């Protein structure tokens, strides 16, 4: 087992973007607490949580910024995108409009961060397959067109949520600064050796 006590702790800011009620908060809640709240409550403004991940070769601290999808909060979002390491753009597979709007969200990220950001396109609510309006193939195609990473999840069922964060962890750059590790909210993960997902860092600009 790796000795994590000597590993540096690097903080990475992840901002979650997307239309209202696509499941941004639910994905974060599933990752943080392995739970799901059936009672919908819209995020007001911006929420913040953080979690330590012990990886195979390093320890990182993920700062998770949950943004509101409502139009009245849109003016707040660019300032949170500006210093982010990762943008997680979420849509609801049962809502075609939320999928179409992801192009705008990705554009917003690139306008603020250029190519210096990892972007992940996430199709959520795969547990509602009988109501699906957006195929997996359409999601994969859009991700290729936008040159971003892609995954489908179900925050309700817990499907692929840990895998989402593994993909992100694999794509993140190496440790460059040392800090004292924080102990609360720890999750241990061994990302796959296959690091091809890191192509999400590339940008056609």
Swiss-Prot record:
Q: Which GO terms describe its molecular function?
A: GTP binding; GTPase activity
Q: Does the keyword tRNA processing apply?
A: no
- Lipid (S-geranylgeranyl cysteine) linked to which residue positions? 203, 205
Provide the alphabetized UniProt keywords: Cell membrane, Cell projection, Cytoplasmic vesicle, Golgi apparatus, GTP-binding, Lipoprotein, Membrane, Methylation, Nucleotide-binding, Prenylation, Protein transport, Transport
Q: Name one GO cellular component term.
A: Golgi apparatus
Phenotype on disruption: Sterile with fertilized embryos failing to develop in the gonad. This may be due to cytokinesis defects in embryos and increased permeability of the embryonic surface to exogenous small molecules. Furthermore, the exocytosis of cortical granules following fertilization is delayed and only partially occurs. Another study suggested that sterility may be due to abnormalities in the hermaphrodite sperm. Lowers rate of spontaneous reversals in locomotion.
State the Pfam families in the record.
Answer: Ras
- Residue(s) carrying Cysteine methyl ester: 205
This protein's membrane topology, according to the annotation, is: Lipid-anchor
Q: Which InterPro entries match?
A: P-loop_NTPase, Rab, Small_GTP-bd, Small_GTPase
The UniProt annotation places GTP binding at 18-25, 43, 66-70, 124-127
Q: Give any single GO term for biological process.
A: intra-Golgi vesicle-mediated transport
Where is this gene product found?
Answer: Cell membrane; Cell projection, Dendrite; Perikaryon; Golgi apparatus
Tissues where this protein is expressed: Highly expressed in body wall muscle, intestine, somatic gonad, distal tip cells, vulva, and neurons including AVB, AVD, RIG, and PVC (at protein level). Not expressed in AVA and RMDV neurons.
Q: Which Gene3D superfamilies match?
A: P-loop containing nucleotide triphosphate hydrolases
**Which CDD domains does the UniProt entry name for this protein?**
Rab6 (cd01861)
Q: Is the keyword GTP-binding assigned to this protein? A: yes
Task performed by this protein: The small GTPases Rab are key regulators of intracellular membrane trafficking, from the formation of transport vesicles to their fusion with membranes. Rabs cycle between an inactive GDP-bound form and an active GTP-bound form that is able to recruit to membranes different set of downstream effectors directly responsible for vesicle formation, movement, tethering and fusion. In its active GTP-bound form, acts redundantly with rab-6.2 (in its active GTP-bound form) to positively regulate the retrograde trafficking of cargo molecules from endosomes to Golgi structures.
Q: Which family does it belong to?
A: Belongs to the small GTPase superfamily. Rab family.
Q: How does it assemble?
A: Interacts with GARP complex component vps-52.
Q: Which NCBIfam families match?
A: small_GTP
Name of the protein: Ras-related protein rab-6.1
């Amino acid at each position: 087992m790796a000795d994590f006590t000597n590993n540096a702790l690097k903080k990475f800011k992840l901002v979650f973007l997307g239309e209202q009620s696509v499941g941004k908060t639910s994905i974060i809640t599933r990752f943080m607490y392995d739970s799901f709240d059936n009672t919908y409550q819209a995020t007001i403004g911006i929420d913040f949580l953080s979690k330590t991940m012990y990886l195979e070769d390093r320890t990182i601290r993920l700062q998770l910024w949950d943004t509101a999808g409502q139009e009245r909060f849109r003016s707040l979002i660019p300032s949170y995108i500006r210093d982010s390491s990762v943008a997680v753009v979420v849509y609801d597979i049962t809502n075609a409009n939320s999928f179409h709007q992801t192009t705008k969200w990705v554009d917003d990220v690139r306008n603020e961060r250029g190519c210096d950001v990892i972007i992940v396109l996430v199709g959520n609510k795969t547990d509602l397959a009988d109501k699906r309006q957006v195929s997996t193939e359409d999601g994969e195609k859009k991700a290729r067109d936008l040159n971003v990473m892609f995954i489908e999840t179900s925050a309700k069922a817990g499907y692929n949520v840990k895998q989402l964060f593994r993909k992100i962890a694999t794509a993140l750059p190496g440790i460059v600064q040392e800090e004292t590790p924080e102990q609360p909210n720890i999750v241990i993960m061994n990302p796959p050796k296959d690091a091809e997902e890191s192509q999400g860092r590339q940008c056609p600009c």
